């Protein structure tokens, strides 16, 4: 007799950004394994729903086989499924959630850096990894002599330091900056520079993807990441990435597939300390990148693409295995 398909409940904040992308990726991977997924808001279910879920759980017939929490923790969802797992982002993890970690059957970590953090908190943590969408348009697409910096709505992507570097170097190639205010009316620092183009309005996904594939050099000096979607997307395009020499950024981007910039700690965020690149080191990294012959650029970009493909396959395999084990 064929076993019924597993029922997985994805619990997340549909923010139109990183968490939405995470949910889309997880749901897509599980669907290829014939696993049904339902999306639920991260706020707790209504009281009547929780009561019904407890009755179902006690009777051995919970609504779902597995809850997968993306970043947020709310134990009131636990009765809705036989098992509960968490895929956290350490930089957004609230300290008050720590006491709930032991209530999860597993904490699935996106990076080895995250794994060490959650193991130290006593969680039943294991390495899952993660992936990004494949952003490559066509292999071998001609590149332009320009540089791309995408910050989205974040103020923690090193944008100010990148712009300060370009202020000092009017001879550098054109920098394209994609950054929107984190909230309406917020003043962004976008100084008028002859070799900088700003996109401070919302671009379509197609427009962003075209930019990612147009430029061979992407500058992504993040202060903190849960996984590193920005770098993974850049490497999927075969771009050379300049980023922060601190975890987890330097776990994804290694010297054979990018350029790492020394950083210093600044302020705590969640379970981590933010890391800010040093301005002279960033300038040196850009100078080094611009001096690379085309053959070296292509070799480094090819290494990044190869890493993305290997990592993507491994993540998909691990996620399917973890969820299948619930059945």
Positions of predicted regions on the chain:
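Conserved donor-binding/catalytic core segment of Leloir-type glycosyltransferases
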Residues: 138-157, 163-167, 175-176
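Short hydrophobic beta-strand element within catalytic cores of glycosyltransferases
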Residues: 240-243, 248-253, 259-260
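Aromatic "clamp/platform" in nucleotide-sugar-dependent glycosyltransferases that forms part
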Residues: 223
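Nucleotide-activated donor-binding/catalytic signature segment of Leloir-type glycosyltransferases, i.e.
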Residues: 185-209, 217
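N-terminal pre-catalytic "stem/leader" segment of glycosyltransferase-like enzymes
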Residues: 1-70, 317
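Acidic anion/phosphate-binding donor-loop and adjacent secondary structure
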Residues: 96-97, 126-146, 187
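A charged, aromatic-enriched C-terminal amphipathic alpha-helix characteristic of glycosyltransferases
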Residues: 277, 290-324
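Extended catalytic core of nucleotide-activated donor transferases of GT-like folds
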Residues: 40-117, 121
